[in-house]
Every structure is written in C-alpha cells, then in structure tokens.
C-alpha cells in the first residue's frame, strides 16, 4: 500500500492563546512548515499560525 499524500496538521497561534486550526497539506509538494495569518478569537486580531504535529 502506498503512503498517503496528504497529512493532517495543526496550526497553532503564535500569540500563545492556545487557539489552533486543523487542516491538511500535501507532504510531497509542501515540505517546509506552513505559516499563515489567521484570526485568533481570544486575542481578537489576526496573528501568525505555525504548523505543529497533531499528537
């Protein structure tokens, strides 16, 4: 059986509020860590969310 191309990842807020989004990425084409600006409802502003592993 072949390895799956997409993996689930967690995007954790850089504002240290504990807010995270769960999304998926293609691990074959996107080898570097994802950094996105998304809304943090606890901080009530847009902050950077960095990719971490789902435990």
Swiss-Prot record:
InterPro entries: Ribosomal_bL33, Ribosomal_bL33_CS, Ribosomal_bL33_sf, Ribosomal_zn-bd
Cellular component GO terms held in the UniProt record: cytosolic large ribosomal subunit
GO biological process, one term: translation
Keywords carried by this UniProt record: Ribonucleoprotein, Ribosomal protein
Top-level taxonomic group: Bacteria
Pfam families the UniProt entry points to: Ribosomal_L33
Gene3D superfamilies linked to this entry: Ribosomal protein L33 (2.20.28.120)
PROSITE patterns recorded: RIBOSOMAL_L33
SUPFAM superfamilies (UniProt xref): Zn-binding ribosomal proteins (SSF57829)
GO MF annotation list: structural constituent of ribosome
Protein family according to the UniProt entry: Belongs to the bacterial ribosomal protein bL33 family.
HAMAP family referenced in this protein's UniProt entry, alphabetically: Ribosomal_bL33
Protein name: Large ribosomal subunit protein bL33
Naturally occurring in which organism (per UniProt): Azorhizobium caulinodans (strain ATCC 43989 / DSM 5975 / JCM 20966 / LMG 6465 / NBRC 14845 / NCIMB 13405 / ORS 571)
GN (gene name): rpmG
């Amino acid at each position: 059986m072949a390895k799956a191309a997409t993996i689930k990842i967690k995007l954790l807020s850089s504002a240290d509020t504990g807010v995270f989004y769960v999304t998926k990425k293609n691990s074959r084409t996107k080898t570097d860590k994802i950094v996105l600006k998304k809304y943090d409802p606890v901080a009530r502003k847009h902050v950077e969310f960095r990719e971490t592993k789902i435990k």
